[in-house]
From Swiss-Prot:
Catalytic activities: 2 glutathione + H2O2 = glutathione disulfide + 2 H2O; a hydroperoxy polyunsaturated fatty acid + 2 glutathione = a hydroxy polyunsaturated fatty acid + glutathione disulfide + H2O; tert-butyl hydroperoxide + 2 glutathione = tert-butanol + glutathione disulfide + H2O; cumene hydroperoxide + 2 glutathione = 2-phenylpropan-2-ol + glutathione disulfide + H2O
GO MF entries: glutathione peroxidase activity; phospholipid-hydroperoxide glutathione peroxidase activity
Gene Ontology cellular component terms for the protein in this record: cytosol; mitochondrion
Residues annotated as transmembrane: none
Positions in coiled-coil regions: none
Modified residues (N6-acetyllysine): 86, 112, 146
Subcellular location: Cytoplasm; Mitochondrion
Modified residues (Phosphoserine): 32, 195, 199
The UniProt record lists the keyword Acetylation: yes
Top-level class of the enzyme under EC nomenclature: oxidoreductase
Organism from which the protein derives: Callithrix jacchus
Name of protein: Glutathione peroxidase 1
InterPro entries from the UniProt entry: Glutathione_peroxidase, GPX_AS, Thioredoxin-like_sf
Its biological purpose: Catalyzes the reduction of hydroperoxides in a glutathione-dependent manner thus regulating cellular redox homeostasis. Can reduce small soluble hydroperoxides such as H2O2, cumene hydroperoxide and tert-butyl hydroperoxide, as well as several fatty acid-derived hydroperoxides. In platelets catalyzes the reduction of 12-hydroperoxyeicosatetraenoic acid, the primary product of the arachidonate 12-lipoxygenase pathway.
């Protein structure tokens, strides 16, 4: 196990973790989302796919939120330094630059943090240990080694912005998707998950 995963090794589900929303306030315990299907993505506001990916993240939250889906975004600057804004600047960047046009995320957006390396948020250390590679691209790696800005480097690292993790209502990670697998294409998996009903009584 990579050292970054040791802190999260004892966890059985994502409900063991918490994070602070971008808007501030007290940390949100993911345990408060028990019995929901979760779609977790690492995001960046200056990526070449920011417009597509952020707008696609709004769609499942809008359509499937009433049925029990919660979409969570975690800004990170690891991949190409494409989230170099401060926490207080990110929402304005999304609203006026990319995607722009007054865009506002309708999903939970958390404070900027790390998804790889020794400083990785324990949630992402847990997700990476539970699902070591994207299901659609088991060989996914950072394309350009010069862009690796964290240490230690592990085989299960998140390779780029907008990797996705689908988590069941029991808090157990089910599937990981690469940056190339669009959020909109995950909807059949989400629909199938939600149609099973809660399994976390």
């Amino acid at each position: 196990m990579c050292a970054a995963g040791l802190a999260a090794a004892a966890a059985q589900s994502v409900y063991a973790f918490s994070a602070r929303q971008l808007a501030g306030g007290e940390p949100v315990s993911l345990g408060s989302l028990r019995c929901k299907g979760l779609l977790i993505e690492n995001v960046a506001s200056l990526u070449g796919t920011t417009v597509r990916d952020y707008t696609q993240m709004n769609e499942p939250q809008r359509r499937l939120g009433p049925r029990g889906l919660v979409v969570l975004g975690f800004p990170c600057n690891h991949s190409g330094h494409q989230e170099n804004a401060k926490n207080e600047e990110i929402l304005n960047s999304l609203k006026y630059v990319r995607p722009g046009g007054g865009f506002e995320p309708n999903f939970m957006l958390f404070e900027k943090g790390e998804v790889n390396g020794a400083g990785a948020h324990t949630l992402f250390a847990f997700l990476r240990e539970a699902l070591p590679a994207p299901s659609d691209d088991a060989t996914a790696l950072m394309i350009d080694p010069k862009l690796i800005t964290w240490s230690p480097v592990c085989r299960n690292d998140v390779a780029w912005n907008f990797e996705k993790f689908l988590v069941g209502p029991d808090g157990v990670p089910l599937r990981r998707y690469s940056r190339r697998f669009q959020t909109i294409d995950i909807e059949p998996d989400i629909e199938a998950l939600l149609s099973q009903g809660p399994s976390c009584a």
